[in-house]
Each structure stands twice: as structure tokens, then as C-alpha cells.
Swiss-Prot record:
Interacts with TDRP. Testis. It comes from Alouatta seniculus. The lineage of its organism: Eukaryota, Metazoa, Chordata, Craniata, Vertebrata. Proteolytic processing into mature chains is required for histone eviction during spermatogenesis. Transition proteins (TNP1 and TNP2) are required for processing. The keyword Phosphoprotein applies. The gene is PRM2. This is Protamine-2. Belongs to the protamine P2 family.
Length: 100
């Protein structure tokens, strides 16, 4: 299950433009200290969560489906997603799943 939403490329230029406009307005009002505003921090956190949410998955759903399509149900239950705590990656177990 994917928890994080990745922004589409069409949304990024608009967001960058807003940040640029906000930065220019801050400069006009005489605020010399330019730290990350609350909006900037929030956006920064969101984009990085979206990025790392996808990197945590070791196998894509499509690949898991393709690998386990012709296997027994017991093998399908023990796919790499459920063995994260004890094993790292798909290729460590070769006895039950030959196609990993």
C-alpha cells in the first residue's frame, strides 16, 4: 500500500513560482532574515516523504504479481513485503521462490 502521494510534474512549476513571489515580497517589506517559512518546511517535508515512500518498497506490485502468478498460495503469502524484519530483499530466499 502506497501511503504518500507523489506530485505530478505539472504542479511543481506553480509551487516554485509561488515561493519565488513570496520571497520577493518578503524582501520588499524589509525582512532581511530569510529562513524557511512554515509553508516552505511543510512543502519540503511532503516532497521528501513522497520520494522515500517509494524507495522503501523492495519489489513493485507489478513485479510481485508477475513473479508469484504461477506459484502456490503459500509462496504468495510469504513474499518479500512480509519478510522485511528477518530478511533483506527478495533474493535471499531461493528454495520456495525460484523466480526472485
Amino acid at each position: 500500500m502506497v501511503r504518500y502521494h507523489v506530485r505530478s510534474p505539472s504542479e511543481r512549476p506553480h509551487r516554485e513560482y509561488r515561493q519565488l513571489v513570496n520571497g520577493q515580497e518578503q524582501g520588499r517589506h524589509g525582512q532581511e532574515e530569510q529562513g524557511m517559512s512554515a509553508e516552505g518546511v511543510e512543502g519540503y517535508g511532503r516532497t521528501h516523504q513522497g520520494c522515500y515512500g517509494y524507495r522503501r518498497r523492495l519489489c513493485s506490485r507489478r513485479r510481485l504479481y508477475r513473479v508469484h502468478r504461477r506459484q502456490r498460495r503459500s509462496c504468495r503469502r510469504r513474499c518479500c513485503r512480509y519478510r522485511r524484519r528477518n530478511r533483506r530483499g527478495c533474493r535471499t530466499r531461493r528454495r520456495t521462490c525460484r523466480r526472485h
